[in-house]
Regions:
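Periplasmic-binding protein-like
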Residues: 1-7, 123-146
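Extracellular/periplasmic bilobal clamshell ligand-binding domains
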Residues: 147-183
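Short beta-strand->loop
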Residues: 77-99, 108-110, 145
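A bilobed periplasmic-binding-protein/Venus flytrap-type ligand-binding module shared by bacterial periplasmic
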Residues: 15, 100-113, 132
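Active-site rim elements
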Residues: 3, 106-109, 161-163
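Solvent-exposed, polar/charged alpha-helical surfaces in well-ordered, non-transmembrane soluble domains
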Residues: 32, 47, 51, 55, ...
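Ligand-binding pocket segment of bilobal, Venus flytrap-like solute-binding proteins
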Residues: 2-6, 10-13, 17-91
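Soluble non-cytosolic domains of exported or imported proteins
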Residues: 8-9, 25, 44-47, 62, ...
């Protein structure tokens, strides 16, 4: 297994999700199981994990799909070779669905121009903005169908845990990583 550091927010959110579903004991066992199978110390970003799997340095990793989208879109022969050297799996499709990270927007209470801020957020949820965001950043849109390189990965069942729950569970998630020896 190749992974990023446990201090990365992606992994903290993932652990918070596991914690919410499996409870403290189940999440601790999961983290210990992953950490005990590391092929190397946690390092790099998701692209580094994907490249490590493609090169055979490790057999499996967890990565955000937009990093795969970047490799799909790059056009570089070495990136095509990386994509050709991996298999993409969306886990937990028969039960809770795949954990997802989100990009969000909000308006702070002290915002000087709340009305325009709200209009901007409303625009961000339009079909046009979601398409631009999906194609420009290679992320699955919140609203509508995926377009661009990411669309080749297909659809998947998403974990429905609220992002607010993930925030509440972050502190405990970090503690479980520490106990598991996942640096």
């Amino acid at each position: 297994v190749c992974m990023r550091s446990s201090g990365n927010i992606y992994n903290i959110s993932l652990m918070a999700s596991v914690l919410e579903v499996a409870g403290a004991e189940g999440a601790a066992n999961w983290a210990k199981g992953v950490a005990s199978n590391f092929a190397r110390d946690p390092q790099s970003n998701d692209t580094g994990q994907i490249r490590a799997v493609a090169s055979g340095e490790c057999k499996v990793s967890i990565a955000n799909t937009y990093y795969i989208g970047r490799l799909l879109a790059s056009g570089k022969p070495e990136d095509k070779a990386v994509i050709d050297g991996i298999r993409i799996v969306f886990p937990n499709q028969s039960d809770r669905g795949t954990h997802v990270n989100i990009s969000g927007a909000g308006v702070v209470a002290s915002a000087p121009n709340k009305e325009n801020a709200i209009k901007f957020i409303e625009y961000l949820t339009s079909d046009e903005a979601q398409r631009i965001f999906a194609e420009g950043n290679n992320e699955y849109p919140v609203i509508g169908e995926a377009t661009g390189p990411i669309s080749t990965l297909g659809s998947f069942n998403e974990d429905q845990i609220s992002a607010s729950i993930l925030g509440v569970r972050q502190k405990e998630a970090v503690e479980l990583f520490d106990q598991a020896g996942w640096l």
